[in-house]
Amino acid sequence: MVGLIETFRKNNNEKLKNDQDKEKNDREHLRQVRADRRERYTKAVEQLGDEKAPIRMGGVYTLVGLVDEWLEDESIEKYEDRLKEGQVIINNLCAYIRSPFNLASHYDELSKANPTPKGIYKGKKEKFYADKATLDSEADVRLGIIKEIHDRLQGPDKNTPGAWSDFEYDFSGSTFFYPIDFTNSYYAKPINFSGSTYTSWADFSGSTYKGWAYFNGSTYQRETNFDGSIYKGRADFSRSTYKGWAYFNGSTYKGRAVFSDSTYKGRAVFSDSTYKGWAYFNGSTYKGEAYFGGSTYKGRAVFSDSTYKGEAYFRNSTYQSKAIFNGSTYKGRTVFSNSTYTSWADFSESTYTSWAYFSGSTYKGEAYFRNSTYQSKAIFNGSTYKGRTVFIGSIFYSDVSFGENNENGSSSCFTKYTPNFYQKNYYQKTLFGSINNNFTVDNDKGHPIYLNPEGIPLKCKFLTLEQKEYLEGKFQEIEKINNKLFEVKDLKEKEELSKKLQALNEELHKWREEVTTV
């Protein structure tokens, strides 16, 4: 019996020693593995600064492989600790993308096959081809980084995370002198692309952003695509310039969406989107067509103080909170038809150069169209107004119609209140320039528009011949300046023309206030 006990004790001691030795060996192995990774990391970072592009590319692939190794290292129990190790390397890759590259400032010229007659490479063919090769090789290195990141931001199914989706990415202030493809990407953490410049096309469509997404203060020189994306946090695209077509349609914004103070030089498409938080588009300029139709705004929608130089479409939209369009200028055809406004809607202090359509819509709250100028026809046919509706202080230079809507065959209906074209308390009236108006509304279900013997709303007046001539002259001046703005390329001359245009608009605004004041 004593022998058995002694044998058992001896075996236990040997097992304990073996376990301790194994644990020690494992720790030593892990230490060596991690030391090896850090050594490879240091060498790879050094390679990123090498003059030769293939060596820089080798450093990129080493760093990418190290991130994968850290994430797959099950000897590190906590996933957060693995992420922490990987994030250090991600920060290096992002820093490389952010780093300036001098030749990128000549991208437009170096992207051509041969030197241009008027460029800085005129008469310098050898330097042109040498710089072009240098720029292209650096673009390949950076494209390699973007591709490796992009591949790991995509899950097996749509809108699912990839292996690298839990990292934070900071590309702020970058100049992307190569095409950007981040389609169908999934970001679980905040991302930052603010203050960036895209010299080629950029595609972020079909992506999901769980945290804040910063794209503000950026410039896109070619086509840009953010279609079909989901933003679960704040999305900031403010103070940006889009020189090519910009697509944001079919997207969902669950947090605040900010597109204010931006300029769109090509077509801008925001249609068929859903905004669950507040949406800001104020202070923006659209030089091409602007599409916002078929969208739903569950929070406040702010489009005030904007300029639309092309056609603007807002039809078939639903506004469940306040809709604010005041202080805007529409130079092309504008369509707000077949929309629903649950709260109050404000279109006041606006100017419509071409036809303006508000037909077939429902206004459940107050609707303000006051202090505005309608140069061409204004169509309000077949709409329902359940709250107070105010047109006072406006000028309808051409025809205005509240009659039957061609689509549903019904006239406009003011269910609770007679519309205000004259308001003694505000000392304002509305002026009309045409005799071909239609003020026929549904009197059975709502209130009439009371007319004077001249056939326009009570207490209102027709524009005098002198007033019409003044307006016609100002309209022609504005059109002339707008045409010049499209033709002129000199920035200083453009600035002077813009100042003249602003002064004319301010003069018209002041004049309208004076002539509509009782």
Where are these predicted regions, by residue range?
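N-terminal leader/targeting and pre-domain segments
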Residues: 28-30, 42-46, 52-57, 61-64, ...
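Membrane-embedded hydrophobic alpha-helical segments
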Residues: 1-35, 39
